[in-house]
Regions:
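Cofactor-binding beta-sheet edge motifs in enzyme active sites
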Residues: 1-234
Length: 234
């Protein structure tokens, strides 16, 4: 699996490092949402950092073969869960109890059954910096890629770090399926073809972005029209 990397900083924001590029589909942002879902915190509290390797980015997949969404929702989910675990541990250290006594949501870590007892992400980030070690990124997991270790080292000390490799079970190959139906009229004398109607259906699982999903279906259809009408055997 790929690696996920984020930092919760003293300004209270979650900075999600994204190694995938922006091809125009928005996947560089959409796949980062998995980290915020793990933290049960509003997307407006996130900042996505992407671009070249000078931005300290984690080991990532190529953007081909329908890999991006599958690989990077999982990697960011792993980083989000790692950050959540560290938030719970810090809360237990400072406020008593065990990490499992605490939950994370809405930019805070708080005691289950008593949301008033807890701390903000901003405060937890300050505590992570004070504690050091794995909490602020001075210690990182052994199983992550060397590129991610370098990125984590550059970001160490900025706040609470979530850094993890996607070690989740795969359950085999996961594929999405789409099927299209075209109604056409063919002029038997001239060979002209006119498209009258087109319907498409897709079994795609969880939709990250409805607009991008629709664009995938429309774009695939248009590409298919071009193949069918504009190409021939030579």
């Amino acid at each position: 699996g790929m690696d996920g990397l984020l930092t919760i900083r003293p300004d209270g924001k979650v900075y999600i490092q994204q190694g995938v590029g922006n091809l125009g589909t928005g996947s560089v942002f959409d796949t980062a949402r998995a980290a915020m879902e793990a933290l049960q915190t509003d997307w407006e509290q996130a900042e996505v950092v992407w671009g070249d390797t000078s931005k300290h980015l984690p080991w990532s997949s190529v953007q081909a073969g329908s890999m991006t969404t599958h690989a990077h929702t999982r990697a960011n989910w792993a980083a989000g869960l790692d950050a959540k675990s560290k938030l719970q541990e810090i809360a237990a250290r400072d406020l008593g109890g065990t990490p499992s006594s605490y939950d994370v949501a809405d930019g805070r870590v708080f005691r289950r059954g008593n949301r008033s007892q807890g701390m903000t992400f901003a405060r937890a980030a300050e505590r992570a910096i004070a504690l050091g070690g794995k909490y602020d990124g001075h210690e990182v997991p052994e199983d992550i890629n060397d590129m991610t270790k370098t990125a984590g080292g550059a970001l160490a000390g900025l706040g609470l770090m979530g850094i993890a490799k996607d070690n989740f079970e795969t359950g085999g190959r996961n594929m999405s399926y789409a099927i299209g139906f075209a109604e056409v009229e063919v002029d038997l004398e001239t060979g002209g073809v006119e498209l009258k109607d087109y319907k498409v259906s897709s079994d795609a699982g969880t939709i990250l972005n409805p607009r991008t999903f629709a664009a995938q279906l429309h774009g695939g259809g248009i590409q298919g029209f071009g193949h069918a009408r504009g190409q021939k055997w030579v």
